[in-house]
Each structure stands twice: as C-alpha cells, then as structure tokens.
Regions:
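N-terminal leader/targeting segments and the immediately adjacent pre-domain N-terminus
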Residues: 2-6, 14-16, 20-116, 141-144, ...
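Active-site-proximal loop and beta-strand segments within enzyme catalytic domains
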Residues: 47-49, 69, 73-94, 123, ...
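Active-site SXXK
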Residues: 57, 108, 122-147, 173, ...
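Catalytic-site signature segments of enzymes, centered on catalytic residues
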Residues: 110-118, 180-261, 286, 291
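Active-site-proximal alpha-helical segments within enzyme catalytic domains
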Residues: 129, 220-227, 291-313, 369-385
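Active-site helix/loop module of the DD-peptidase/beta-lactamase fold
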Residues: 141-180, 232-290, 322
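Active-site Gly/Thr loop motif
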Residues: 265-287, 329-380
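Structured C-terminal helix/loop/strand segments within mature extracytoplasmic catalytic/sensor domains
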Residues: 362-407
Length: 407
C-alpha cells in the first residue's frame, strides 16, 4: 500500500536559544510595519548571528551547547526497542536516527546549531502540535463553527454514533479529554494488551464523561485526525504543506507517513455536486506505532518561529493569533483539562521548567524530541534525541542564564 506523503522538510535537531529580555512596548504600527521589525528566514537559507549581537553571552551559550553533548537519549539508533516500548507497529520506521542535535533561535536568528540539523527523523508526538495547527486552520476557515460543537454534528462515519461518543466536542479532542471509545486501525482506545501497546499498556478502568478526565491516548488522537480529514476532504499532509510549510519556506525533505492499514474512503463532492468515495490515508498524531511526521530540526525551527510570531510569517497571517493564544493556554472550563496542557501543546504553567517563564510552552515527543518556545525572551529551541525531563529544564536554565543584563 503506498504511503501518503507531503514534501519532505529539513530537520535541525533540538534548538536551544537564549534571548535578551526586552521591555514590552506599546506599538501602533500596522501589521506590515510590525512584521518588518522581525526577521523571517527565506527558503533555503537562515542568517546566523553571534549571541553577543543579540544581548547574550557567547561563552555561556557555547558552554550550554557543549553540555548538551552529554545528554543524548539511550534509545537505540536502530529503533530496535520500538515494539517493546510501544507495541505492535502499524507503519514504517527508518533504519536509523541521527545523533543528538539542535538549534537555538534568538529574535529569529540562529545563534547556536549543533549536530545534523538537516537529518529527517520521526518526531513522535511533536506531530500533535502540527495537528493542533491544522485544527486551528479548520476553525479559521469556518469549517467548524465552534470548538465546543459536538464532532458528530460534522462527522457521520459512525465514529460518534454511540450515545457516549456523541457528546465529544472538538475541544475535548484537542485537550485529550474526549474519552472516545472504539478502535482505530486495529488498536482499541482502552490501551489494553501487552502485544498491542508494549510498556505503554494501561489497566482497565471505568470510562468517564467526555471533558472530565485527561488521558494521553494516541488512539483517540488518531480518531481526531480522521475527523479533520473528513472535513478537509484532502490528505492532511497536503493541507499542512500548502497552508503552513510552503509559506514558511520549509524544505522538501519532510514526510508525513500513514500506517500501512490507514486508508479510508472519504466522501468528496465533485464539480457537479455529486459525491464520490475517494481513498485517502489518515495520518497519526505520533510515531508510537511507526509512521508519523518525519522532519528535520531546521524545519521544526521554522514551525516554532511561526508559532512564536503568533501565526504570522513575513507580513502574512497564516493562522489566527486567536488560535495560537487558545492553543497555548490552559482550559480550566473543562473539569478534566490538564493545567499544563493547551490544545496539544505542553505549557509551563505548572513550572515544569523552573528557570523558564510560565508563559513558555513546548511541542513534546518521545525520543525525546522538543520544540520549546519562549515568547518573553523571543527564543525558540529545537532539541532532538535528548534525555528529556530534568535535562530539558537544565538546558533552558543554561540558555536563559546567558542573557546579558540590559544596559
């Protein structure tokens, strides 16, 4: 079965950056004028600057980057433990991965780059933040009237027919509180069974009302992805390519693979108004069972810079500022929403990275792969194949410590 692909994008491993603090100012500039104050890298190139050119200490950044070389993940480079960790694979995996790598952006410029940042590797659940962006585009286009609408009002493929599933809203999916019940591509939403789920298998429990319990669950995210496909009626990698990745100058090296058994029939109207069932592949929200988004660190950095700039790229608003704000904020209006989780973005609201501002946030994937964004200091850090946890907190601490006091 052929794999669904979009263009491939260069990858620039983990980006660790520190930027000098800037006092907020009130601006009356027009959007075009405001955008002219920011640097946006043209396709195929990216300007480098010394940290000291942007208010940071050169030696401190160099030391932080040197420290990262001691923090590579112990995951085998050949993905040989994939089944043990996650269970039976459904899609492809590369033969090997790159070593630890990353890039640090300050004010949009590269101030540090290490390892092979063009290697195209699986990024695991960082892909969820890309799905979040497609979700935002869907709302921006009016394809969904309200994020609190039940998904079943829009999607009629049987996935939301049962009374319990009929209560699930788009917001529930985006906050991982949906409690959707069913099976996707041979994987049950219960996560029961060692063979199917490896070390990630769960214990039996009672199902809760949608919106009342957070559970990190890739089966439900894959259901969410299929629902978005049902609205767009074209492969989501194509949506991502034309609406986001091409406009930000991403490379042609990134790939979004589907599972081998993830071909579905989508009802697509033709020019005369008649409907035709068109086979399409539905993408996953990660690489837990193979497939998923394979991308370079440098392309991740472009995506991170777009989010840092609140959805604007070089004078063009690709996705609304309102969506970026909602996606990177907690949602206490839902009883089960996690206080440090937005719409498929991890937040620092609970001080997971103690030295970093509470306003910073990250796309996170196993491996560990991460795109950390710090709007307060105008930083983006992409870091690939690191130990995660305390290592992340320490790296951000070292980057932030490199910010020189304002004169």
């Amino acid at each position: 079965m052929p794999l669904l692909r979009s263009l491939l994008i260069p990858c620039a491993a983990f980006v660790c950056t520190i930027f000098c603090a800037v006092q907020p100012t009130v601006s009356t500039a027009t959007p075009a004028a405001a955008s002219a104050q920011h640097y946006f890298p043209p396709a195929g190139t990216w300007q480098h600057k010394k940290p000291s050119d942007l208010g940071m200490n050169d030696a401190a950044i160099a030391e932080a980057v040197a420290w990262t070389q001691t923090q590579e993940t112990d995951w085998p480079k050949d993905f040989s433990k994939q089944s043990e960790i996650f269970g039976r694979p459904l899609g492809p995996l590369p033969k090997t991965r790159a070593s630890i790598n990353g890039v640090v952006l300050k004010n949009g410029y590269i101030i540090a780059e290490f390892g092979d940042t063009t290697a195209v590797d699986p990024t695991y659940s960082v892909a969820k933040s890309y799905l979040s962006t497609i979700h935002g585009l869907t709302l921006d286009r009016g394809m969904i009237k309200s994020i609190t609408d039940p998904v079943g009002q829009y999607i009629h493929d049987g996935g939301y027919d049962e009374p319990h599933n009929s209560l699930i809203t788009w917001q529930h999916h985006a906050t991982q509180t949906s409690e959707w019940q069913g099976e996707m591509f041979g994987k049950p939403s219960t996560f029961l069974g060692k063979a199917e789920f490896g070390a990630g298998e769960m214990k039996p429990r009672d199902i809760k009302e949608p919106g009342t319990l957070f559970e990190y669950n890739d089966v439900r995210i894959n259901r969410f992805s299929l629902s978005l496909l049902g609205l767009w009626k074209r492969p989501l990698p194509d949506v991502l390519k034309t609406e986001i990745m091409d406009p930000i100058g991403a490379s042609s090296t990134w790939q979004y693979h589907a599972y081998d058994n993830a071909t579905v029939n989508i009802d697509v109207p033709d020019a005369s108004g008649n409907s035709t069932l068109v086979p399409m592949q539905s993408i996953s929200g990660g690489t837990r069972w193979g497939a998923g988004l394979w991308i370079s660190t440098l392309d991740h950095a472009r995506f991170g810079l777009l989010i840092l700039r609140k959805g604007e790229w070089n004078g063009k608003q690709l996705i609304s500022k309102e969506w970026i704000k909602e996606a990177t904020s907690p949602h206490p209006e839902l009883a089960g929403a996690k206080s440090d989780y937005g719409y498929l973005w991890w937040l620092n609201t609970d001080n997971a990275w103690p030295a970093a501002p509470r306003s910073s946030f990250s796309a996170q994937g196993a491996g560990t792969n991460s795109i950390w964004i710090d709007p307060e200091h105008d930083l983006v850090v992409v870091w690939r194949w690191h130990k995660g946890g305390n290592a992340q907190a320490e790296f951000y601490k070292r980057i932030l410590a490199a910010i020189e006091p304002a004169p």
